[in-house]
Amino acid sequence: MNMNVREILENITKEHASDIFVVAGRPLTYKVSGKMHTYQEERMKPDMCRDFVTAIYELADHRDISQFETTGDDDFSFAIVGVSRFRVSTYKQRGSYSAVIRIITFTLPQPSELMIPDAVME
């Protein structure tokens, strides 16, 4: 997998995904409307996950990765101008770097998109 992480985040965000999952042994996966999709079929190797997670820290204004490396987990957020905001949870799973990335859009959805009844909106 060619890993331009910024480009991957942009592409997945355009798919209206809510979450991205980075786990060794699985393809890069994202969720759209409750359904899981793979970004590419190639399974991510531990070194690919390490590179992906490290790139996320660099995109997050070069956040210090040492806490994650010491404790095995970390939570933070960052934004890519013109793309979206992201809330990230990094952790080690079976010794490999892993992450769950929640995509937080810049705009709020319409109540109808959330299926909120009209009676509640009145």
What are these regions (language model features)?
Residues M1-E122:
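N-terminal "pre-motor" subdomain/linker immediately upstream of P-loop NTPase catalytic cores
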